């Protein structure tokens, strides 16, 4: 496995302008450029040779392993025109024209979603050139009229005076407009690298019409870089940097490449603008897809970044990826939706973007149309559905990883002006490493759970209804799904034991135990003397002894991690939590309900002891955590957890909870209206918690992440009575099933 890690690390350290496959279509346009010295020969004869040497058996050019009619015909026609322009390769041209004649009618049958970028602009222009060259194809094909109509619609959306004076996506397809535009104006929109919006074909056309030296330099560099051919777009540096980081994270292997990922994101951050970014640095045109991916990754890694960039893509009540686009791309809206998931409080633009993107994606799902115009991937519908059904505030990392390992493919194909591949984004090495890592962690987790089972069997907890073996498995799953790294084995065990104990105690006092018993348990925790338990019930004695044993054990381990005794701090954690349980019990028995503010301030989630105890075992040295119970991040976690639990309760009419209190304070509301208000309050608290987690502060990041993980766990499994049904399949996928 470590050889795979080093191979990936070498890839990451070699990132530059992007690894991308070559394009026959764009190479054909470069091959058409006449020599700038005035001689009757091509400026790039090596590109002409590449065309003659790379025709496929059926007479077309393109991706050998994937046939799409639009792509193959467009490339075949471009190559045939290039060869005919220089009166060479007659047999190759003849074979290409045979392919075009045979295949052109099939364009009517192909899904227009798979039409290459700018096809409706460049293909009609090439048809006109083919007619001028008297190439033998059927110019009366009905499908051509449809394409001409699409071209007209596109040009109506972006008028020619705009194309010639302002950066738009049509700069990427100027070869389709070369007879009508003013090249003296358009060349002023040239990118710093000499290209026209990083398109080799568009730049080659500009070079033909202007002889611009920077265009020539750009193409010379590309032909040399790609060994006599060119890609459909270059550079793709920001795109590659971002999508690699995204894939590594979703595959669960990013922890091996912390420094390399930081370098990649530092690079992207240098080119971030207040209008967003595109696929390449210094682009005069921004797009919502790359901007969304950059925003989400940068923000989640702690970079200071404003969501105001999304105003660039807001048009009235909707959002677009590009101004003047023909239609929405599923992946663009998918990434916009994902970006909205890292929203901080008050960020209205992200709220609007997320709402729009979700509505669009839900509509596509209902229509069974979750496929995209930019990528042909293994399971895009599954990716989108998982994101819609599992929003970030209710998603556990390892479950998402397990799902994505099944969805990731090493051979995804992207749709640009032609089909292309990104070998550093999609490759078998990533997948092999992800599978090996997941199976390694899963095997370790299984051993840890067996250790927990032995502890459970040796304890007296099984006599209580609330301490079931299935619940033990569920609490361990919550740890394995969030703090899964091999080196955090003690943290997982401590988390599992603490949450298991607190859930069991909570259930006991909800259904069986008396207020006096709870007071006795708290008194015993204060005395902390297993040999002097006082006059209390047998059940309280057992609960205290089991709690005493695990805290003592955790204290011994904690000394090794912290270099000092943490026993007092661990006892205080349990005293605080039990006291909050007592307060809630007293409120339930009282005729006077607390205010919502009082109720939430006093609420301490059943998961709090697990979070605060585990903090000592995640590799960070903590000076003190005495004030953590009153800290903002702890309060936010508890509040968010309590609110989400209350919104899923089955006892809205009788129990003391956020909804009944909210109704009491707002009697004009219906029950459903109060529920909606409390759900909105829960969402706002999750936003606050995310903000607090990502801000720099005295508490180490690894510790803050525990609080966020805990709130997400409570969002995934709100209410102990619903845990079993919802968890069983998740537990199986993460703990029991190896990845094959």
From Swiss-Prot:
Motif placement: DXDD motif: 287-290
Any one Gene Ontology BP term: diterpenoid biosynthetic process
Pfam families reported for this sequence: Terpene_synth, Terpene_synth_C
InterPro entries assigned to the protein according to its UniProt record, in alphabetical order: Isoprenoid_synthase_dom_sf, Terpene_cyclase_plant_C1, Terpene_synth_N, Terpene_synth_N_sf, Terpene_synthase-like, Terpene_synthase_metal-bd, Terpenoid_cyclase/PrenylTrfase
Assigned keywords, A-Z: Isomerase, Magnesium, Metal-binding
Residues that coordinate or bind Mg(2+): 287, 289
Enzyme class of the recorded protein, top EC level: isomerase
EC number: 5.5.1.12
PANTHER family, sorted: ENT-COPALYL DIPHOSPHATE SYNTHASE, CHLOROPLASTIC (PTHR31739:SF4)
Record remark on domains: The Asp-Xaa-Asp-Asp (DXDD) motif is important for the catalytic activity, presumably through binding to Mg(2+).
Descriptive protein name: Copalyl diphosphate synthase 2
Organism of origin: Selaginella moellendorffii
């Amino acid at each position: 496995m470590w050889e795979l890690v080093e191979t990936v690390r070498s890839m990451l350290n070699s990132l530059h302008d992007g690894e991308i496959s070559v394009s026959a279509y764009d190479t054909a346009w470069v091959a058409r450029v006449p020599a700038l010295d005035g001689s009757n020969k091509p400026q790039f004869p090596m590109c002409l040779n590449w065309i003659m040497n790379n025709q496929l058996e059926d007479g077309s050019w393109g991706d050998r392993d994937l046939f799409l009619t639009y792509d193959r015909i467009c490339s075949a026609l471009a190559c045939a025109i290039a060869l005919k322009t220089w009166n060479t390769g007659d047999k190759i041209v003849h074979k290409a024209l045979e392919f075009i004649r045979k295949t052109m009618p099939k364009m009517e049958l192909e899904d227009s979603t798979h039409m290459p970028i700018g096809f409706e602009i460049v293909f009609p222009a090439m048809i006109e050139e083919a007619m001028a060259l008297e190439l033998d194809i059927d110019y009366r094909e009905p499908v051509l009229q449809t394409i001409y109509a699409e071209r007209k619609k596109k040009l109506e959306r972006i008028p020619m005076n705009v194309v010639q004076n302002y950066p738009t996506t049509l700069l990427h397809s100027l070869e389709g407009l070369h007879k009508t535009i003013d090249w003296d104006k358009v060349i002023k929109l040239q990118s710093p690298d000499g290209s026209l919006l990083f398109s080799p074909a568009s730049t080659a056309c500009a070079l033909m019409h202007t002889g611009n030296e920077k265009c020539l330099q750009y193409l010379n560099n590309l032909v040399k870089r790609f060994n006599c051919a060119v890609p459909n777009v270059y550079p793709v540096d920001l795109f590659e940097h971002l999508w690699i980081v995204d894939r590594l994270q979703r595959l669960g292997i990013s922890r091996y490449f912390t420094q390399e990922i930081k370098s990649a994101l530092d690079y992207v951050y240098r080119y971030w603008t207040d209008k967003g970014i595109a696929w390449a640095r210094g682009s005069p045109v921004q797009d919502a897809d790359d901007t969304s991916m950059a925003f989400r990754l940068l923000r989640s890694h702690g970079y200071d970044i404003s969501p105001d960039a999304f105003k660039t893509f807001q048009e009235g009540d909707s959002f677009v990826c590009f101004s003047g686009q023909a239609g929405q791309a599923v992946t663009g809206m998918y990434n916009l939706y994902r970006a909205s998931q890292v929203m901080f409080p008050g960020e209205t633009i992200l709220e609007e973007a997320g709402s729009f993107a979700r509505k669009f994606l839900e509509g596509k799902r209902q229509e069974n149309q979750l496929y995209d115009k930019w990528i042909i991937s293994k399971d895009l519908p599954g990716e989108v559905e998982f994101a819609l059904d599992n929003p970030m505030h209710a998603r556990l990392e390892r479950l998402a990883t397990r799902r994505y390992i099944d969805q990731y493919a090493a051979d995804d194909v992207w749709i640009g002006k032609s089909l292309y591949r990104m070998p550093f984004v999609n490759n078998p090495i990533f997948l092999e490493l992800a599978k090996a890592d997941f199976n390694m962690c899963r095997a370790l987790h299984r051993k840890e759970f067996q250790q927990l089972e032995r502890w459970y069997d040796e304890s007296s907890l099984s006599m209580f209804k609330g301490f079931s073996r299935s619940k033990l498995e569920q609490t361990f799953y919550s740890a394995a799904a969030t703090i899964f790294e091999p080196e955090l084995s003690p943290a997982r065990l401590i988390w599992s034991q603490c949450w298991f104990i607190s859930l069991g105690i909570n259930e006991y006092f909800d259904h069986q135990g008396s207020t006096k018993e709870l007071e006795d348990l708290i008194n015993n925790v204060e005395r902390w003397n297993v040999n002097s338990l006082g006059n209390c019930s047998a059940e309280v004695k057992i609960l205290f002894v089991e709690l005493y044993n695990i805290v003592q054990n955790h204290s011994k381990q904690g000394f090794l991690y912290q270099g000092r005794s943490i026993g007092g701090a661990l006892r205080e954690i349990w005293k605080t939590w039990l006291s909050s349980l007592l307060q809630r019990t007293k409120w339930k028995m009282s005729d006077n309900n607390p205010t919502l503010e009082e109720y939430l301030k006093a609420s301490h989630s059943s998961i709090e002891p697990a979070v605060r105890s585990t903090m000592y075992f995640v590799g960070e040295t903590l000076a003190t955590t005495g004030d953590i119970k009153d800290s903002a991040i702890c309060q936010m976690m508890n509040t968010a957890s309590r609110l989400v639990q209350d919104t899923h309760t089955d006892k809205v009419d009788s129990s003391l909870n956020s909804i009944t209190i909210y109704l009491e304070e707002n009697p004009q509301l219906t029950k459903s209206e109060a529920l909606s208000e409390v759900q909105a309050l829960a969402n706002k608290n999750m936003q606050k918690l995310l903000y607090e987690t990502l801000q720099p502060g005295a508490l180490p990041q690894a510790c803050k992440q525990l609080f966020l993980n805990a709130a997400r766990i409570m969002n995934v499994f709100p209410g102990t009575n619903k845990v079993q049904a919802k968890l069983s399949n998740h537990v199986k996928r993460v703990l029991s099933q190896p990845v094959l």
